[in-house]
């Protein structure tokens, strides 16, 4: 079951959780709104409210008979690590560590109906056309995808964050908000220790 989290739906999340359980679903996919396309018509959450929802989702995940997956909220991994007292870089054998690489352009790509390759359906910057250069070469060699896979190239507080290798922030939301997919994720409330730069 898929759910979009925005200001108009956040209050219904406990009811949706109960519905997911009642229906016997095995996975609840919780999408945090990215203000792109028709998503611009909806009001997103502020960072503090999003943080509270992520904490609630993690707490909920410990008591429900189904899995919970977030989309466009990679900071859920940070919240999970902080709540469990785990290290900032989870080992690859850990479920959080294995899923740590899946964000726009890093473990995921979107091919449009015309063959354009994008890091995500929510990040409308093309790396080229798969009809001309091929999917594998564009994914592996384009500057756009290479930059998104290199978490040390992130800017702002995401670049300074000790969780950047397991989180990475929403590159789609950064792009939608700033025009630069390497900028900070404006939905994340976390400020790394010692960071004194600009906040989104």
Go through the PLM ranges and name each one.
Residues 197-200:
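Iron-sulfur (Fe-S) cluster-binding modules
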Residues 33, 73-195:
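Accessory C-terminal segments flanking Radical SAM cores
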Residues 2-122, 126-127:
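Radical SAM enzyme [4Fe-4S]-AdoMet core and its adjacent flexible, acidic
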